[in-house]
Amino acid sequence: MLALYLIAGLLVGLLVYRLHLDPLSHIPGPFLAKFIPICNIRMLHTGRIVFTFRELHDTYGPVVRIGPSELSFATVTAFDSIYGFEGEKKFTIYGSRRGVVSSASGTDESLGNATSKESRRKLRPLITSTLNELMASSAEEYCHLALTEQLAAHRVGQDGSTPISLSTLNYRYLWQLANMVAFGNRGQEAHRETFNPHIRWPSPFVSFIDLLFIFCSRATIQQHARTAYKAWQAIRFVCRQTTQGPQVDFIADDSTFPDNLHRRLRQAAEKAGLDDVSDFTLLVNSMILRFSVYGTSDHMINAVFYYLLRHPQCLKRLEKEVLNAGTSVEELSDNRLAKLPYLNACINETFRISPAFNGGILQRVSCGATVDGVYVPPGVAVTVDNYTLGRSKQYWENPDAFCPERWLESSDKNVFKASRPFLIGSRQCPGRQMAYQMFRILVAKLVYLYSMELVNKDFDIERDTFCGLHWADLEVDAILKPRTDVLGY
C-alpha cells in the first residue's frame, strides 16, 4: 500500500511540476505535449510532419511547446539565433535527433554531424574545396551523362503517347549521378533498392528515442546511442517488424570515373598532411554526398516537375526561356543556365514551398539561451521548420501559391530570408552550389528535349505523400513528347 501512495505522490508531483513549475509551462501547445512527445510521434507515424508543424503554429503562435522538453519556433529571427554563427555558441546537435541518429548509424564523423569543433575546423575547408573543384571539373559532365543514359534506358520519347513515371526516371538517374560524384562508379539498380532502407529507417527510430527523452537526458541518450538502437531493434524483432540496420554502406570504388569526391578527399588530406583524418572519415563524408544527391534531391527534383506541370503558365514561360538559351541541348552549359532568371526562380520557389529538410531533423539542443525573448533552459531542444517559414503569411504574399515570379522582383511583401533551405552558419550545406548546378542542368535539359503533359492529375502532394524525416512517395507521371525527331540521347 505504501508503494501505491508513493507512486501516486510521484504522479501528482509530476503533474503539478509539468503544469505549473516547469520553466516551459507558460509556452502554449497541446496539453499532452507537457508530458509526452505526442506531437513528434504522431507527426512521424502519420507522415505529416511539415503539415503538422504548420498547423501547430497556426493554432498556438510563433513558439509552441511540442514535447516535455522541446520547443518549435516559426520566425526568421529564431532561425538566425539557432542556426547562425552566434547560435553555434548557444546550441548544439549533441543530444538532438540528428546527433543520436548519426551516432547510431556511424556517420557522426561527417562534417554535418560532427559535434567536435576541432573536427569541423579540419573537415570544412577540406570538403568545401574538394566539392568546389569537383563541381568546376566534372559534376556538370556527370549530370549530362547520368540523365542521358537513363533517358536511353527508359526509351523516353520513343512512343510519344505512352506515359512514363517521371519520378522513377528521376530516382534512377540521381542514383547514378550520386555514385559518380561520390565514389566514381555507376550505381546499379539492385544497389539502389538495398540503399533505400538506409534513408527510411531513422523515422521510426526517432520516435523511440523521443520516448527515451522522457526518462533520460538528451546527453545520456547521445552517449548510449548504439545501445538505444540495439534496444529498438530488439523491440522490432519481438514485434516481427523489419530490423534493417543503419550500417554505413559503401560501393567499392572501381574508379570508372576517376574524378570523384572520395579520391579528391584522400588526395587533399594527404597534401594537407592531415594524418589524423582517417580514411573512414573520408568515406563517411563521401557517402553523405551520395545520400544528399540521391536521398534528398529526389524529392526536390520531383517537386519541381510536380509544380510546373500543375501550373502550365509557369512551364510555358520556362520552356520559352530554356529553348532560347541555345540552338542544341549540348549548348546548355551551367554557365549559361545560371544566367536564366526564370529557371532559377522556379528552383528557388520549389525550395520555398516544398523544402527537403524539415524541423524534425533540424533540431538543436540549448546550452542556455534566449530566443525571441523566450528563455530556453539547457537540455531543451529547439527547432525551426523550413516548411512552416516558407508558408508563413507573415513573410510571403500568397504563401501557398507556386509563384516563381516572386523571386524576380523585390517586394516588401516577400521576405526571402524566410527560405534558406541549405541552412546558415557553420553547418550550412557545403554542397549548396553543386545542388543548384545539378537542378539547373537536369530540369533545363528535360524541358529542352521534351514537351510534357501531366497524367496523374489527381495526385496531391499533401494528401498522398509520406513526410517523415525524409519526404517520400511524390509521384509524377507524364507523357514526354520529343521536340525534334532526333532524340537527345
UniProtKB/Swiss-Prot annotation:
Transmembrane segments: none annotated. Keywords: Glycoprotein, Heme, Iron, Metal-binding, Monooxygenase, Oxidoreductase, Signal. Its cofactor is heme. Heme binds at C429. It catalyses: 2 fonsecin B + NADPH + O2 + H(+) = bifonsecin B + NADP(+) + 2 H2O; 2 rubrofusarin B + NADPH + O2 + 3 H(+) = nigerone + NADP(+) + 2 H2O. Pathway: Secondary metabolite biosynthesis. InterPro entries: Cyt_P450, Cyt_P450_E_grp-I, Cyt_P450_sf, Cytochrome_P450_monoxygenase. One of its GO terms (molecular function) is heme binding. Residues 1-18 form the signal peptide. Glycans are attached at N113, N348, N386. Gene3D superfamilies: Cytochrome P450. Its EC number is 1.-.-.-. Belongs to the cytochrome P450 family. Cytochrome P450 monooxygenase; part of the gene cluster that mediates the biosynthesis of bifonsecin B, a dimeric gamma-naphthopyrone. The first step in the biosynthesis of bifonsecin B is the production of gamma-naphthopyrone precursor YWA1 by the non-reducing polyketide synthase albA, via condensation of one acetyl-CoA starter unit with 6 malonyl-CoA units. This is Cytochrome P450 monooxygenase bfoB. It comes from Aspergillus brasiliensis (strain CBS 101740 / IMI 381727 / IBT 21946). The gene is bfoB.
